[in-house]
């Protein structure tokens, strides 16, 4: 069976792997010059690895880890301390420390009761809210709890949290940075379903909240192993190939795709296959779908979905920004020093960040140079129209406010990557508009983390969606 896949993000790549394993002849068409979608990275003219976002691998990314094991990439992950660290103005740190002699849910309870990020009053109210949530039921009835959580999509997490006794202090100091890191929007604008789903995984499975990061850049340590695996099985991956049009025909009351028109520069060609998968992001699928298909609600609902803007900043320094204790270590350039983990903050326009020279040293540590901070500006709306230099200077000022001891260090290089439309906006009430991987078109399928799956718009969500798409194809087309 021949399958044509539009989009070489994780969703498209995951779809291709399962189809290739089943003996299908697969072609992937990607409009960008590199694969990976929102997890993409590339090397600039000066040899710097540039990423489109900050990519963290949670322990509950089970299907992604299975994929990585299959292609030989799981060993490229670096395990981090089981602690979620918050950096506040003035260099003060707080944490959710999940390290404990026993596992879930007790390690989570310990983390929330001992955190210095919240006041005693906030911690008590936090305990009341989480203690009256579906998460408690999930300890004995996971599927029943998930059904309840899915039904909470219509309200924001902030409204749900306050209605269960939670405080605005907890939202501001802890939950907003986490919501921004997960979905690029705050607790007032993110669905309760989205946040509680993640909490459910964390509460039930000890490993779910464990963090890992890649040894180096996504392209080198995630995508290249996938591409080698696919190429060994005959899959063809074409970059700089934009799909201009989906051709279709109707016969005997059934609509079928007959081909896709693919552009290579000024040239176009029509590709035919037995099955077609669009593994795009929100703007991509909205652009490529034939308008005539909007007569089906499954396709029309896609246009009710939205994507959020984000800006990712990378900054190189001549010392170690996150080294808070030792001035000599901070200024020396013989070895890396500082906080080797994902970091959150409630006191800057970037909600989460990391020093990649520490967390992912193979591509980002450079002898004789210091920190390479990667910071995610959320919400990204105010920054999309700003110049890269203005954004870098704005972020630098906030870095110095978080780490006053770093003011003696100089920024030596920066990069800014803006995405006007990035993650699917996980706003209240939007879940009902997310399409299934199977569509009303018999030989046309969807993948992408905006499609139906329980994980947020994430690497795991993309992987799950791709594997679901492959299963539907194999169940319905290849018989």
From Swiss-Prot:
Q: Known Gene3D superfamilies for this protein?
A: FAD/NAD(P)-binding domain
Q: Which reaction does it catalyse?
A: 9,9'-di-cis-zeta-carotene + 2 a quinone = 7,7',9,9'-tetra-cis-lycopene + 2 a quinol
Q: Would you say which domain of life the source belongs to?
A: Bacteria
Entry keyword set? Carotenoid biosynthesis, FAD, Flavoprotein, NAD, Oxidoreductase
Molecular function in Gene Ontology = 9,9'-di-cis-zeta-carotene desaturase activity
User: Which residue pairs form cystines in this protein?
Assistant: none
Quick one: which pathway? Carotenoid biosynthesis; lycopene biosynthesis
- State its Enzyme Commission number(s): 1.3.5.6
From the UniProt record, give one GO term of the biological process aspect: carotenoid biosynthetic process
**Matching SUPFAM superfamilies:** FAD/NAD(P)-binding domain (SSF51905)
Q: Which cofactors are required for activity?
A: NAD(+); NADP(+); FAD
Q: Which family does it belong to?
A: Belongs to the zeta carotene desaturase family.
Q: What does the function comment of this entry state?
A: Catalyzes the conversion of zeta-carotene to lycopene via the intermediary of neurosporene.
Protein name, per record: Zeta-carotene desaturase
Phylogenetic classification of the source organism? Bacteria, Bacillati, Cyanobacteriota, Cyanophyceae, Nostocales
């Amino acid at each position: 069976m021949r399958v044509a896949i539009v989009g070489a993000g994780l969703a498209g790549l995951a779809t291709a792997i399962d189809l290739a394993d089943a003996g299908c002849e697969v072609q992937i068409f990607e409009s960008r010059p590199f694969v990976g979608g929102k997890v993409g990275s590339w090397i600039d003219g000066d040899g710097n690895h540039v990423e489109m976002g900050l990519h963290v691998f949670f322990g509950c990314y089970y299907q992604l880890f299975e994929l990585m094991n299959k292609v030989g990439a799981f060993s490229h992950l670096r395990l981090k301390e089981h602690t979620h660290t918050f950096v506040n103005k003035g260099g003060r740190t707080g944490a959710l420390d999940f390290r404990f002699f026993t596992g879930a849910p007790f390690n989570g309870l310990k983390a929330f009761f001992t955190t210095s990020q919240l006041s005693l009053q906030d911690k008590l109210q936090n305990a009341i809210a989480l203690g009256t949530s579906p998460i408690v039921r999930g300890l004995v009835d996971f599927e029943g709890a998930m059904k309840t959580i899915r039904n909470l999509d219509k309200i924001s997490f902030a409204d749900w949290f306050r209605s269960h006794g939670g405080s605005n202090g907890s939202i501001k100091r802890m939950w907003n940075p986490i919501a921004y890191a997960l979905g690029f929007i705050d607790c007032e604008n993110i669905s309760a379903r989205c946040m509680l789903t993640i909490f459910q995984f964390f509460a039930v499975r000890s490993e779910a909240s464990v963090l890992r990061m890649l040894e180096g850049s996504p392209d080198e340590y995630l995508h290249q192993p996938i591409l080698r695996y696919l190429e060994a099985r005959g899959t063809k991956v074409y970059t700089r190939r934009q799909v201009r049009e989906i051709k279709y025909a109707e016969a005997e009351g059934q609509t079928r795709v007959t081909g896709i028109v693919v552009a290579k520069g000024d040239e176009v060609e029509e590709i035919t296959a037995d099955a077609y998968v669009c593994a795009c992001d929100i703007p991509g699928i909205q652009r490529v779908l034939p308008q005539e298909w909007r007569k089906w609600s499954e396709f029309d609902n896609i246009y009710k979905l939205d994507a959020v803007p984000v800006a990712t900043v990378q900054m190189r320094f001549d010392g170690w920004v996150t080294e808070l204790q030792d001035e000599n270590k901070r200024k020396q350039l013989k070895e890396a020093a500082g906080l080797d983990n994902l970091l959150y903050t409630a006191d800057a326009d970037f909600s989460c960040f990391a020093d990649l020279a520490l967390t992912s040293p193979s591509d980002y540590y450079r002898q004789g140079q210091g920190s390479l901070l990667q910071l995610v500006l959320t919400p990204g709306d105010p920054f999309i129209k700003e110049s890269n230099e203005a954004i870098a200077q704005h972020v630098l000022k906030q870095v110095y406010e978080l780490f006053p001891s770093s003011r003696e260090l100089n920024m030596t290089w920066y990069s800014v990557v803006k995405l006007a439309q990035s993650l699917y906006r996980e706003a209240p009430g939007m879940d009902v508009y997310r399409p299934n991987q199977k569509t009303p078109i018999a030989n046309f399928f969807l993948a992408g983390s905006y499609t139906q799956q329980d994980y947020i718009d994430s690497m795991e969500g993309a992987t799950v969606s791709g594997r679901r798409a492959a299963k539907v194809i194999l169940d319905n087309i290849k018989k």
